[in-house]
Regions:
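Feature marks short, highly hydrophobic, charge-poor N-terminal signal-anchor/signal peptide-like helices
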Residues: 1-10
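Active-site His/Glu-centered metal-binding helix of metallohydrolases
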Residues: 19, 23-28, 105, 109, ...
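Divalent metal-coordination and catalytic microenvironments
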Residues: 21-24, 60, 103, 387, ...
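Membrane-embedded helix-turn/re-entrant segments that form the catalytic/gating core
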Residues: 30-111, 190-196, 203-217, 314, ...
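Alpha-helical transmembrane signal-anchor/signal-peptide segments
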Residues: 32-37, 122-140, 145
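Internal alpha-helical transmembrane segments
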Residues: 67-135, 158, 185-186, 372, ...
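Functional transmembrane alpha-helices
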Residues: 86-87, 91-94, 207-236, 241-385, ...
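PDZ/PDZ-like peptide-tail recognition elements
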Residues: 97-131, 166-174, 178-226, 280-308
């Protein structure tokens, strides 16, 4: 069910964002007087279509992993003299650049609109208050204290943990990062600098702030078992609802630390208290259908105090402003990450593919529509930035050729363009393949 849900959620994201992207090209082409033969969502065999009064075929094709706008173009077909004024290749450099750039621009505008809706409706969140700083961690070395709230990272406002995680993740490979904090409930600022020179973390296994030793305020958890999953390691070991768990040395178990230990996949030796009787148990994690280690227990959760809860909600004008700010912030962060991947400051192992997107889509849609919309906006920004990357097969590559044409006064030769397209296609396939390989390795 989870796989099916993730797949459907992923296909909806792709269908919506590809439609938005291609509509940008289509709208700009129409505005510039270019005849459009076909607007297709998907590739391959057409399974549904209709034609409008201007002769454009709107189609849905069999492979729902992309789309295209086919325009009248003398480079690909014979164009009658009477239609040359409507051909893409007969438009000015500025008009062609506008048509090409309109696709990524549409993705950015969609992200702004999506975040506008998110911030108008309101998205529940948790204030970035630190509950604990792990001993000997990078955060501890910087003398960061519990019960402080992170308000800025390198001068950028941090209203929630999601923003903090995103900002910190982009600092990987840098030497330091500056944090602004206030004692919770106070306005007195503290400034701390974290030394990142030896910092590494695996985004698949931990958060960026968690790897620095920062533990956020979360729902309080008691290791009194409230549920045992059927056919789980816990049930096989005879654990029951109401059992209280401790480490083998009788020390208290922190739930989130316990989860980290479970993900190591190694046997866990525990003390169990049941009706005043103590005994030992060893839980050996097993892999579930999501290929994650589990033992099949649920502790007792207590609601997080309201003082730590917040809702990111604004009036319409401010929500629009926040939507623009968020889109620009994500765009810049995406560019920084791409730059670090190219320079080697960030491992290519962090590159994700369609499976990562599908998992994110499925997870966000299960949480709620507002989170799904926020995820869609994030992917839309990434799609816009990636399409502006100067590879010849992408919009950015086409724009590079147009800049060269404007500087030289004549188009780049077809031979150079064809060779560039082949090289670009190979590089793009290699990147996509690497992303897919990384996805499979994470399963």
């Amino acid at each position: 069910m989870s796989f099916l849900w993730s797949t459907v959620s992923f296909l909806i994201v792709i269908a919506v964002l590809v439609t938005v992207h291609e509509y940008g090209h289509f709208w700009a082409a129409r505005k510039c007087g270019v005849k459009v033969h076909r607007f297709s969502i998907g590739f391959g065999k057409v399974i549904w279509s209709r034609t409008d009064k201007q002769g454009t075929e709107f189609a849905v094709s069999a492979i729902p992993l992309g789309g295209y706008v086919k325009m009248l173009d003398g480079r690909n077909e014979e164009v009658p003299e009477t239609l040359k004024s409507q051909a893409f290749d007969h438009k000015t450099v500025a008009q062609r650049a506008f048509i090409i750039a309109a696709g990524p621009l549409a993705n950015f505008l969609f992200a702004i609109f999506a975040y506008f809706l998110v911030y108008s409706i309101g998205i529940p969140s948790i204030k970035p208050v630190i509950d604990e700083v792990r001993p000997q961690s990078i955060a501890a070395m910087a003398q960061i204290q519990p019960n402080t709230q992170i308000t800025e990272i390198d001068g950028v406002s941090t209203p929630d943990w999601e923003t903090i995680n995103m900002l910190l993740a982009t600092k990987l490979g840098e030497s330091k990062v500056d944090l602004t904090l206030v004692e919770f409930g106070s306005n007195i600022e503290q400034h701390r600098t974290l030394d990142l020179s030896n910092w590494t973390f695996d985004p698949e296994k931990q958060s960026a702030f968690g790897s620095l030793g920062i533990v956020p305020v979360r729902s309080k958890v008691d290791m009194i078992l409230s549920k045992i999953t059927e056919n789980s390691p816990a049930e096989k070991e005879g654990l029951r609802k109401g059992d209280k768990l401790y480490w083998s040395d009788n020390s208290k178990i922190e739930w989130y630390t316990f989860l980290e230990k479970v993900q190591e996949g190694k046997p866990l030796t525990l003390k169990v208290e049941r009706d005043g009787v103590w005994f030992d148990k060893t839980l050996t994690p097993e892999l579930n259908e999501k290929k994650r280690w589990f033992v099949g227990i649920s502790p007792t959760f207590y609601p997080l105090a309201n003082e730590y809860r917040t809702e990111l909600k604004y009036d319409m004008l401010e929500a629009l402003q926040k939507g623009v700010e968020k889109t620009f912030q994500l765009s810049w962060l995406t560019i920084k990450v791409i730059g670090k991947l190219i320079t080697g400051n960030l491992s290519l192992n962090n590159l994700g593919g369609p499976i990562s997107i599908a998992k994110g889509a499925g997870a966000s849609s299960e949480i709620g529509l507002i989170y799904y919309l926020s995820f869609m906006a994030l992917i839309s920004v990434n799609l816009g930035i990636m399409n502006l990357f100067p590879l010849p097969v992408l919009d950015g590559g086409h724009l590079v050729f147009l800049v060269m044409e404007a500087l030289k006064g004549k188009p780049v030769s077809e031979h150079v363009q064809n060779v560039s397209y082949r090289i670009g296609a190979v590089l793009l396939l290699m990147l996509m393949g690497l992303g897919l390989i990384n996805d499979f390795l994470r399963l």
